[in-house]
Regions:
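Catalytic-site signature of metal-activated, phosphate-bearing donor transferases
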Residues: 1-156
Length: 156
């Protein structure tokens, strides 16, 4: 039985606003499923990864100020950045100024390159409106990465 893991891409909803959301413009790879239980870091099992072109809406950061403070204060990476400074940064981002910011991730440079805005008061409205945005996963990138993974793990 060959061990594999499946990776998809999420659209991180960064902040909920009155009439919509701010989201991270670039879709980010995450591990979705596996047939093994040998997790290492961030659900990565260090086995062959098959990337699929699925987008998942991830509301991880779209919380109240109190909830976000609790999240990042208890996060395993809470020593990797200044929590108070980042929370203040998050609080001050809004619909009129979000385009002024880049490299949004608290400690991984270029992971979250920039924000974009999507209208929608409910999750259903946000998803419906995100479908019309130009968010996609490069097919050539998927193919190349899947071929590399196949070759890498074929001879292990």
């Amino acid at each position: 039985n060959k061990k594999i893991q499946i990776a998809a891409y999420w659209i991180t909803i960064f902040k909920k606003l009155k009439e919509g959301v701010l989201y991270i413009e670039n879709a980010e790879k995450f591990y979705l499923a596996t047939n093994t239980n040998s997790y290492r870091i961030a659900r990565n099992c260090k086995v062959q990864t098959i990337r699929v072109p699925f987008l998942v809406v991830h509301y991880s950061w779209a919380r109240s100020e109190e909830e976000l403070n609790q999240k990042i204060s208890n996060w395993g990476h809470n020593k990797d950045f200044d929590i108070d400074k980042y929370l203040n940064f998050w609080k001050n981002i809004n619909k009129t100024n979000y385009k002024e910011f880049s490299n949004i991730h608290p400690f991984i440079k270029n992971a979250w390159k920039k924000l974009n805005y999507c209208e929608g008061k409910t999750i259903d409205e946000v998803i419906k409106n995100l479908i019309h945005k130009d968010i996609s996963v490069s097919k050539s990138n998927l193919i190349i990465n899947n071929i590399i993974q196949f070759i890498k793990y074929k001879f292990k």
